[in-house]
């Protein structure tokens, strides 16, 4: 796995790449154009594979939930944008994606995967890296799965909600936090309010 330039608490590496957009058109997009929004940027190994369509469709199906959080989801792999389009145009029952609600970018030179530290150099593909980038372009969360295991969209939504809550309120979110749950005031004395309720 490449070391990359993606570091928590620092600006996420910018990229410019050709994407297949939800309307089926090709468009050059860059990370910087999403400043002011949260971004969930995820890599997957290859088009026309097995775990990948389950993840991509799961993110696409819930694009509106992310939109309500002022969050854009973007997928990426090393395949060409033509390959992405062919996969989108393949019916789901034949292992295709069907219509998409999120852009899929093409990284054929592997530079974006390299920058984000997810390149599996011996195979020239990317691991299942996922990056949560805040509305100021700062990288807030990184997870990288090995190839055989997909990711949970529920958990990604929860993390976006938690980071947005801490941004707004300055309190911190305990393990398993969900909207409406108790949070912790990051202060030795004030935190006791939370801990005193624990069994």
UniProtKB/Swiss-Prot annotation:
GO biological process, one term: fibroblast proliferation
Phosphoserine modified-residue sites: 32
UniProt catalytic activity: a hydroperoxide + [thioredoxin]-dithiol = an alcohol + [thioredoxin]-disulfide + H2O
Location of N-acetylserine modifications: 2
Main location: cytoplasm
Inactivation phenotype: Mice embryos loss approximately 50% of Islet1/Islet2+ and HB9+ motor neurons, whereas dorsal-ventral patterning events and the numbers of Olig2+ progenitors are normal. Toward the end of the cell death phase they have equivalent numbers of motor neurons as wild type embryos.
Active site: 52 (cysteine sulfenic acid (-soh) intermediate)
Cross-link entry Glycyl lysine isopeptide (Lys-Gly) (interchain with G-Cter in SUMO1), positions: 185
SUPFAM superfamilies: Thioredoxin-like
A single GO molecular function term of this UniProt record: thioredoxin peroxidase activity
Subcellular location(s) of the protein: Cytoplasm
Pfam families: 1-cysPrx_C, AhpC-TSA
Catalytic activity, EC: 1.11.1.24
Post-translational modification: Phosphorylated on Thr-90 during the M-phase, which leads to a decrease in enzymatic activity. Acetylation increases reducing activity and resistance to superoxidation. Deacetylated by HDAC6 which decreases reducing activity.
Expression tissues: Found in various tissues; high concentration in liver.
Modified residues (N6-acetyllysine): 7, 16, 27, 35, 136, 197
List of residues that carry Phosphothreonine: 90
Keyword flag 4Fe-4S: no
Residue ranges annotated for the Thioredoxin domain, each copy included: 6-165
Induction, per UniProt: By oxidative and sulfhydryl-reactive agents.
Alphabetical keyword list: Acetylation, Antioxidant, Cytoplasm, Disulfide bond, Isopeptide bond, Oxidoreductase, Peroxidase, Phosphoprotein, Redox-active center, Ubl conjugation
Family: Belongs to the peroxiredoxin family. AhpC/Prx1 subfamily.
Additional facts recorded: The active site is a conserved redox-active cysteine residue, the peroxidatic cysteine (C(P)), which makes the nucleophilic attack on the peroxide substrate. The peroxide oxidizes the C(P)-SH to cysteine sulfenic acid (C(P)-SOH), which then reacts with another cysteine residue, the resolving cysteine (C(R)), to form a disulfide bridge. The disulfide is subsequently reduced by an appropriate electron donor to complete the catalytic cycle. In this typical 2-Cys peroxiredoxin, C(R) is provided by the other dimeric subunit to form an intersubunit disulfide.
SUBUNIT field: Homodimer; disulfide-linked, upon oxidation. 5 homodimers assemble to form a ring-like decamer. Interacts with GDPD5; forms a mixed-disulfide with GDPD5. Interacts with SESN1 and SESN2. Interacts with FAM107A.
Protein name, entry field: Peroxiredoxin-1
Organism of origin: Mus musculus (Mouse)
Gene name, Swiss-Prot/TrEMBL: Prdx1
């Amino acid at each position: 796995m490449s070391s990359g330039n993606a570091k928590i608490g620092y600006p996420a590496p910018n990229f410019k790449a050709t994407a297949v957009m939800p309307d089926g058109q090709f468009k050059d997009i860059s990370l910087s154009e999403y400043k002011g929004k949260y971004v969930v940027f995820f890599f997957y190994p290859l088009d026309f594979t097995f775990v990948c369509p389950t993840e991509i469709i799961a993110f696409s199906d819930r694009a509106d939930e992310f939109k309500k959080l002022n969050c854009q989801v973007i997928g990426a792999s090393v395949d060409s944008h033509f390959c992405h389009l062919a996969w989108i145009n393949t019916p789901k029952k034949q292992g295709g994606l069907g219509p998409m609600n999120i852009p899929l970018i093409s990284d054929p030179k592997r530079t974006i995967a390299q920058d984000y530290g997810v390149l599996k150099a011996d195979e020239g593909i990317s691991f299942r890296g996922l990056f949560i980038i805040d509305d100021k372009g700062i990288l807030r969360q990184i997870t990288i799965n090995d190839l055989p295991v997909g990711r949970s969209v529920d958990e990604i939504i929860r993390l976006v909600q938690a980071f947005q809550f801490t941004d707004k309120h300055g309190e911190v979110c305990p393990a398993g936090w969900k909207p409406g749950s108790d949070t912790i005031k990051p202060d030795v004395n004030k935190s006791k309010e939370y801990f005193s309720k624990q069994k």
